[in-house]
Amino acid sequence: MKKLFLVGALALFGAMNAQTTGNFKIGAHVGLPVGDLADSSNLNIGADVAYVWDLAENFKAGVTTGYSYYTGGKTYSYILPGYGTVSVETEGSGIIPLAATAEYAISPNFFIGGDLGYAFFTESNGGDSGAIYYQPKIGYKFNSSELYLGYKGMSKDGNSISSINLGYAFTFGK
């Protein structure tokens, strides 16, 4: 799976490299974990970088990466017969996504978009340390900036990690 994704990413880089106009973006996001992840994490925070090319009048596509951290710190207490009460505190974890990104302008200021790729977990337990990564989003552009709302998710072997995020990005270039 990783090799197939890498070949696809290289093909995307090659196809987009022929385009003449592109923009570099840098941003940050904050989010609330949802689903099962909400039981062990209170917050998702991170930074993003992307490079997108203008492929059509209202359509951009490119590559994105960054770092996203899911906080831990929730404490659970269990009563074990013969041992008393045992408390366990959850630990935080981070991801580094590598994804293709696309954006379609539905008006001069509003856009819909998404990211699709692979997320590498920064904490590995000796096994395969990653998952399929996806993030549909909707946003508003103003001047050289954008504000977006997204649903970030990672999925592997029927398990998923997800959060609802609010992000801000600054665009360098046009």
Feature roles, as predicted:
Residues V30-D36, I45, W53, Y67-T71, ...:
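Transmembrane beta-strands of outer-membrane beta-barrel pores
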Residues M1-N23, K174:
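Cleavable N-terminal export/targeting peptides
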Residues E57-A61, N109-I112, F142-L149, K174:
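Repeated loop/turn-to-beta-strand initiation elements of outer-membrane beta-barrel proteins
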Residues I26-A28, V63-T65, A100, I112-G114, ...:
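Membrane-embedded beta-strand positions of outer-membrane beta-barrel proteins
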Residues Q19-A61, I161-N165, T171-K174:
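Short glycine/proline- and aromatic-enriched beta-strand/turn motifs that initiate or cap beta-hairpins
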Residues L32-S41, S68-G94, F120-G130, D157-N159:
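Flexible, solvent-exposed loop segments that connect beta-strands
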